[in-house]
């Protein structure tokens, strides 16, 4: 249901605690005692694991409260903070008074000052901060009430991105605003996506802030891409056994434009509950989901097995490329995350109210698999950079010249060498919270001999471009990325 890559290359995977007994026991005879649970009052099975990618092993984690449909983010010091959840999980127990309101289906984002903002949630038309340096209250956001469709909602898990001017782009249902969250003021209202169909849960599409480039320009542009979803009324129709075909369109908008307009594109495959993942070379991967129905228990049909690559720098009509399909349906409550080696880890799928492994259309799926983008093909090994320095976990500062030394064994095209920085995202319900890719480019490439090269780059100049914290740093040569290393921007 939820997935987060950590700076130790572990992946934390969460599931709700009230499904009943899982297939993994807690260690050392531990059990969770909770009289509020509907399935098991005493549960000795695990509902969360940490997966070690390098060793292909996992360990059970014990969660104290129900993390069903909660939200999360990595703080600047590298800690995973989870907010909200269901039942007892709605109340922050581990950090007293961490939330002023119960949050379920909310969205988190790291702010330029390192705090978390928590936006929306079921019946929560507001936002709040964590930690709190002012009164422990919420701030009303009427936009979330205005985008709430009666009987369907269609505005849960809103798509939230930090704009380059420091304001928040917030998309819910079929439209968006730009919010000055410090003044609680809407500074821009964006047009409705043409057609007016919803893109937010349960008509679940996905969205990304496209890679930020040309970071030294005074008028840096930022673009958002929203893809997939379900036509209005799909949730109600699916609840009655009528599974409407998912949306086949994407909408792209320059959110920094003084007169922004959505530009529509058509995907090769209709998709609801799909995930959109930024790859280190600046491409976008669309993966998982269904071809009809909506999000929710038993409401999706026609699994979309083929991932699709979106190439944002190409002309309209040539941006999408269908990839090799999987054989495993990844429906409601599936998840994914980019790994440091450039693969995409995909796991889960459970459209049932409990664990159900047999005699159903889409059984509960516990497997993990890795999707390998074409840039990992061995035929590109001579083009693939290998980072020598800096070492992993190095600290870097804002607006500083930084040297990266790499080895590239093949012929080097210096104008096609670039460094990128990717913020690790918290994935749930087809959205990657805090996902962000910055293209640092290269200021200068110097040959050092023996296939070694020094690449000089300039780090982001402001916290508005890149909030402080841990990032994966890649070097990309002719669209072929190196393995990433962890760096801490401060």
Positions of the model-derived regions?
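Beta-propeller and closely related beta-sheet repeat lectin domains
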Residues: 1-4, 9, 37, 46, ...
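Immunoglobulin-like IPT/TIG beta-sandwich domains and homologous Ig-like subdomains
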Residues: 10-26, 30, 38, 46-50, ...
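Beta-propeller blade signature
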Residues: 37, 43-55, 90-93, 124-138, ...
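Short loop/turn motifs that recur once per blade in beta-propeller domains
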Residues: 40, 61-67, 95-103, 144-153, ...
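Asp-box/WD-like beta-propeller blade repeats and closely related beta-sheet repeat scaffolds
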Residues: 90-155
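Beta-propeller domains
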Residues: 149-294
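Conserved blade-ending motifs and adjacent loop-strand segments that build the rim/top face
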Residues: 193-203, 260-275, 303-306, 313-339, ...
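Beta-strand/beta-sandwich contexts
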Residues: 378-417, 486-490
